[in-house]
UniProtKB/Swiss-Prot annotation:
UniProt entry tagged with the keyword Cytoplasm: yes
Keyword annotations of the record: Acetylation, Cytoplasm, Golgi apparatus, Lipid metabolism, Mitochondrion, NADP, Oxidoreductase, Phosphoprotein, Transit peptide
Name the UniProt record assigns to this protein: Aflatoxin B1 aldehyde reductase member 2
Record: active site: 77 (proton donor)
Length: 359
């Protein structure tokens, strides 16, 4: 007769056997390919500013050699120099057999608008600078609250019909505006937006609450800019720098510096970074990855981005060395759970003053 303990073990074994999939099912599961990785896009905002043409060419070459194919620029980047440099690289952008994809953007700033004439003028100027017949992705860089959105979207439809761009993208729009735009485009038979570019990183997660569900509903993929919070998540800055040495970068010495300081340069953000640094040391010891590496690994492995949806991270840089370090970080694996927990604590520390993702 079986003892009570034996009966318990036997029942457990039967229960496990009933729950375990048959060998062929296990083999099928093991043979499935891993889920698609979150993609990487090269952000070119510093080309023509802190990176000259040769440095920019080297960066693009290094990026493409890693197997990535998407480049991101804008009409306004470096007063047009970013597009001009990219156009001079001989990549054959916009050609039918070109494996490199290029995105640019029209904006409503500095005397421009998203009225039909301005949208057309900006895109056609961008095409001349890029030396290509069409761009793969054309963004509306931010809302133009002084122009009816129907006018802008109708203009985009005409430009798309003329073959000047393939996909339509949105950037810095509120979720309700995305819903309105998708509804208008669908009801009018106009080209629907398929990509949204927005601000997202380990300590800036406002997009998760309402925007991400909206994008999933309407089928837009998400491309994240500022994955390092403008460089703050490198850990190289100190809060006191704003009153002291003011190192050249996103936060000092350029026309967008004040915008970036207002976005991220807050005491709680520096406290949050210190918290992550402490967790990295505790989890990894002498072999601890940099804050930069950890922040990028969080984006690729622990954020709400999904490769299956076509989501991507936009990697900016101010030098080839910086780009190569960032690309190496994107190829590293997930973080230790304690570090992921520290990033979550860091987010809760700064969530109350998170900058809006929309403008």
């Amino acid at each position: 007769m079986l003892s009570a303990a034996s009966r318990v073990v036997s029942r457990a074994a039967v229960h496990c056997a009933l729950r375990s999939p048959p060998p062929e099912a296990r083999a099928l599961a093991m043979s499935r390919p891993p889920p698609p990785r979150v993609a990487s896009v090269l952000g070119t905002m510093e080309m023509g500013r802190r990176m000259d043409a040769p440095a920019s060419a080297a960066a693009v070459r290094a990026f493409l050699e890693r197997g990535h194919t998407e480049l991101d620029t804008a009409f306004m980047y470096s007063d047009g120099q970013s597009e001009t440099i990219l156009g001079g690289l001989g990549l054959g952008l916009g050609g039918g057999d070109c494996r490199v994809k290029i995105a640019t953007k029209a904006n409503p700033w500095d005397g421009k608008s998203l009225k039909p004439d301005s949208v057309r003028s900006q895109l056609e100027t961008s095409l001349k600078r890029l030396q290509c017949p069409q761009v793969d992705l054309f963004y509306l860089h931010a809302p133009d609250h002084g122009t009816p959105v129907e006018e802008t979207l109708h203009a985009c439809q005409r430009l798309h019909q003329e073959g000047k761009f393939v996909e339509l993208g949105l950037s810095n729009y509120a979720s309700w505006e995305v819903a309105e735009i998708c509804t208008l485009c669908k009801s009018n038979g106009w080209i629907l937006p398929t990509v949204y570019q927005g601000m997202y990183n380990a300590t800036t997660r406002q997009v998760e609450t309402e925007l991400f569900p909206c994008l999933r509903h309407f089928g837009l993929r998400f491309y994240a800019y500022n994955p390092l919070a403008g460089g703050l998540l490198t850990g190289k800055y100190k809060y006191e720098d704003k009153d002291g040495k003011q190192p050249v970068g996103r936060f000092f010495g350029n026309s967008w510096a004040e915008t970036y300081r207002n976005r991220f340069w807050k005491e709680h953000h520096f406290e949050a970074i210190a918290l992550v640094e402490k967790a990295l040391q505790a989890a990894y010891g002498a072999s601890a990855p940099s804050v930069t590496s950890a922040a990028l690994r969080w984006m690729y492995h622990h954020s709400q981005l999904q490769g299956a949806h076509g989501d991507a991270v936009i990697l900016g840089m101010s030098s080839l060395e910086q780009l190569e370090q960032n690309l190496a970080a994107t190829e590293e694996g997930p973080l230790e759970p304690a570090v992921v927990d520290a990033f979550n604590q860091a987010w809760h520390l700064v969530a109350h003053e998170c900058p809006n993702y929309f403008r």
